[in-house]
Swiss-Prot record:
The record marks R17, S18 as: Reactive bond for trypsin. InterPro entries: Bowman-Birk_prot_inh (IPR035995), Prot_inh_BBI (IPR000877). It comes from Coix lacryma-jobi. CDD domains: BBI (cd00023). This is Bowman-Birk type trypsin inhibitor TI1. GO terms for cellular component: extracellular region.
Amino acid sequence: GDEKRPWECCDIAMCTRSIPPICRCVDKVDRCSDACKDCEETEDNRHVCFDTYIGDPGPTCHDD
């Protein structure tokens, strides 16, 4: 599982309960990371990456 995550970081990850989990990141970002294949523009000129990633969704973008 050395696949690059389709996002640099993720605050709102939605993952299945399977092992390993299959995750999507529903963050709205200014632009998708280079690794994202399926990047959709939102109504407010932001972007959401619709790629899925198998495994840990990685670090959050914002520390509370």
